[in-house]
Amino acid sequence: DPDILKLFGFGHRPDPEGTFPTITDDDDRDAGHGTLLIRQAPELLFLERCIDWLKPGGRIGIVLPKGILDNRTYINYRRWMLSRCKVDAVVTLHKNTFEPDTGVRTCVLFLSKPLEDDPVPGDYTIFMAQSRRVGKDSKGEPVFALDEKGSATSELDEDLTQIAEAYKTFRDIGTFTESETCFTAERGELDDNLNLNPQHYSPELNATLEKVSKFDDKPDWSVTTIGQLDKNIRIYMGPRWSSRSLVV
């Protein structure tokens, strides 16, 4: 609905520099460099409005589709968000978190808006976590932790409690014991894509990649990407693996 989209900066195309129009004039909401879109993802409009309505000095936790964190088509939206808020924490959720109702991969963003006269910090530490156990299966049935004998206990097999405790410690004293689940990244070290996906900064994953890259230093060994082997190769996951575009 154009009457709704024109109320949002995200309802318009960004300019060549990647900025969105500021919507201030009730009588001419489509003024400026932005071109009104035909449609827009509701979650992006929701994100914009949440940040707009957040008072200076306020904090917010918001559940969003995981793709917002690193999808290249969303880079301008991430840039807009980072220019207005400090990202306190990013937590990616297990695929069963909202099952059996939906299997959409989601994340939680914790944002804080600086006081009115304060700029958004240029560099700071971001708490990051990857939830790998949510205490239930895809049907919504509980999954319990096992004891040392392999028998089910009365405790759910989940790591959200651990993540919450680590984040509380991080907020209270500015540090915590990092693990495969919880770690940090620096705002100033975000790549050109402004990637906010914790997986990209996982110590476990990066240690593995570093081990693989060392093979490049060995005689008769070479490390390269699949795309460098054949530019026509496409990789699909799940049921799309049998696509004609896939080279195995």
Where are these regions (language model features)?
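Short loop segments at secondary-structure junctions
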Residues: 112-116
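Conserved Class I SAM-dependent methyltransferase catalytic core
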Residues: 19-97, 102-104, 108-111
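Short glycine/proline-enriched turns and hinge-like loops at secondary-structure junctions
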Residues: 100-104, 120-122, 242
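Hydrophobic alpha-helical scaffolding
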Residues: 36-40, 67, 150-157, 216-219
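Short hydrophobic/aromatic beta-strand or adjacent loop that forms the aromatic wall/cage
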Residues: 104-108, 125, 141
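DNA target-recognition patches
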Residues: 1-25, 195, 199, 219, ...
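Non-catalytic DNA-recognition/assembly elements of restriction-modification systems
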Residues: 166-238
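Conserved hydrophobic/aromatic beta-strand scaffold that supports enzyme active sites
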Residues: 106-110, 128, 198, 248
